[in-house]
Amino acid sequence: MVTDVRDAILRADVDGVAAVLAQDVVWIGTQPGQLCRSRAQVLDLFHRAVERGVSAKPEIVAELENMLVVDPHLDPPAEFNPELHQIYVLDEGAIVEMRDYPDRPSALEAVGLR
């Protein structure tokens, strides 16, 4: 299942990622109030980004037993977080938590790799 998650992320395929999101996935942004508490809310944000012309070329920069550190390589970059990185927490082949970090060093530090 982790391979499915990795493949969906690396393809930057919204439908593929949707298939591996837990129904109760939580996405925590870097700013106060940036919080999604369901698959539907996460997908709504993804779809709105696509409608605005945002694209991604994700790179998995670190892989732990149940976590992936991802550089989404957004184009155009996120306005408030141009070096945005994310940690995806996995459980039984599904993404159960997504957490944003302002840059690679802070994301790697959060998983104990710095």
Residue positions per predicted region:
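C-terminal and inter-domain tail/linker signature
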Residues: 1-114
